[in-house]
């Protein structure tokens, strides 16, 4: 499958929204996560619409804080006009809020998992790729920072809520998206749980 000009345009739009944004607690440009998720979607068989939605999967959620004057409503219209209704619908399934400040983390994540329980397979593909990329990042960062990671990554959620959220997401994908992607996510979630359970014995510093 060749990716065309719509995909190029989606990359440009994502960079426009995320240009000033970094991964939580790091100096890593946020677009690195966007590209990582998109790569996973393609590696696990995604089509161009799914790849476009993966590129744009966080723009509606982050535009109010980082989008340099754009609004979620205007951005939704732009996505639908430039990339079609399918891409917009998939991005909406990936969005847990368009408000800034964001509502409380537990409330947002519970509602998002409920929405994913009704989501089409294309949205589940993107969501599972997003979780896989995040869990791999958490494993890498935990090995470096240990328990300090949770304060840096998401102090509102902390360790137990974060681990519980990824376990709940995994169980949803096991029920609704069986296959290689969910199998790989399960291996990584278990690896993260075991690493944390070891109490920092596998943490490398310096």
Write out the residue ranges for each language-model feature.
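Active-site helical microenvironments for divalent-metal-assisted chemistry
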Residues: 1-206
